[in-house]
Design a protein with these regions (language model features):
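Bacterial Sec-dependent N-terminal signal peptides
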Residues: 1-25
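Beta-lactamase-like hydrolase cores
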Residues: 21-63, 239
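Mid-domain, small-residue-enriched loop/turn segments at the edges of structured enzyme/sensor domains
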Residues: 41, 114, 135-197
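Soluble periplasmic/extracytoplasmic beta-strand elements of cell-envelope proteins
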Residues: 43-47, 55, 71, 92, ...
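Active-site SXXK
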Residues: 63-91, 265
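Short, well-structured active-site flanking segments
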Residues: 78-98, 144, 199-203
């Protein structure tokens, strides 16, 4: 009886708080039940309007794969701030920088290399998830350890970035060593959206690059394509391991409503026994659940 009175009092005094709490609990339950039926390890993190947080199976290490190109982009922004240079700075790319057996639209378009600005290289990494462009940026800034150190300076700790794309290409198991919890990656996105990290034009460029991302349209974005929202995201896609499982299929981003409300959403899928299409559908269905929860009046 006392509990009922307390709940009634909370509802009278803080109706929005109670409704939000009920909504988040229902969302957690629905996601948890859904992922328990999948032939994969699935982790989810949601941050609503920069404060309320929902996590499901967050206490695991999920391979980041190319999601770490977002972390890298922030480290590039910090590097430019410290060295007082702009994203228009040109780098010379040699043909030896363009590995042949990896995903690289940059190599396909300029097989002999050339001069490319930092902005152009980040368009390749963030729009198209180009692996060679990623390693060229690592070479420029000082390697994965520099990115790892910068992200930790933001107060994010439950992750590790140790290896380049070429490292992971040579040994698929190294993909597991670049890892994060879903919440840690959500915190990185929140830092981009809410904090002043470096020069505003550079920070806005990275945000816009997420909005115009061209990969993973069957994931977080899929159920939102006809909705009145702005979506920015970065995907990550792994190969199959020795057991035939997809090492990781990921998507991490934010959804902005016209009324100013937003949520950050990170969905990591590890060691999936499903097909690529069915694994991407897991992400899309969770994205739909989250959108519906936040669309309720």
């Amino acid at each position: 009886m006392k509990t009922n009175r307390l709940n009634l009092l909370l509802f009278i005094l803080f109706p929005a708080y109670v409704l939000a709490g009920n909504r988040f609990q229902e969302l957690y339950t629905n996601i948890h039940q859904f992922i328990s039926q999948q032939k994969a390890e699935v982790g989810v993190a949601i941050i609503a309007d920069g404060k309320d947080t929902v996590t499901v199976e967050n206490n695991r290490r999920y391979p980041l794969m190319s999601v770490f190109k977002l972390h890298q982009a922030l480290a590039v922004g910090d590097y430019c701030k410290r060295h007082q240079i702009s994203f228009d700075t040109l780098l010379t790319v040699d043909s030896t920088d363009l590995q042949p057996n990896t995903y690289s639209p940059l190599r396909d378009r300029a097989p002999h290399g050339g001069k490319f600005s930092l902005k152009q290289l980040m368009e390749y990494t963030l729009h198209l998830s180009d692996n060679n462009a990623c390693d060229i940026l690592f070479k420029f800034t000082g390697g994965p350890a520099v990115t790892d150190r910068y992200i930790r300076s933001l107060g994010v700790n439950d992750f590790s970035i140790q290896y380049t794309e070429n490292d992971m290409h040579r040994d698929l198991n190294l993909g597991y060593e670049n890892w994060s919890t879903p919440l840690a990656t959500a915190e990185v996105i929140e830092a981009l959206l809410t904090r002043t990290l470096f020069d505003k034009p550079h920070q806005e460029f990275i945000k816009e690059a997420l909005v115009t991302c061209q990969t993973g349209t069957s994931r977080i974005v899929h159920p939102l394509q006809d909705k009145q929202v702005t979506v920015g995201h970065k995907t990550g896609t792994g190969d199959r391991n020795a057991s035939g499982q997809l090492i990781a299929i990921n998507d991490a981003g934010f959804v902005q409503f016209p009324n100013g409300h937003r949520y950050t959403l990170v969905i990591f899928v590890k060691d999936s026994q499903e097909s690529m299409e069915d694994t991407e559908a897991i992400i899309a269905q969770i994205s739909e659940m989250v959108y519906q929860a936040f669309s309720k009046p």
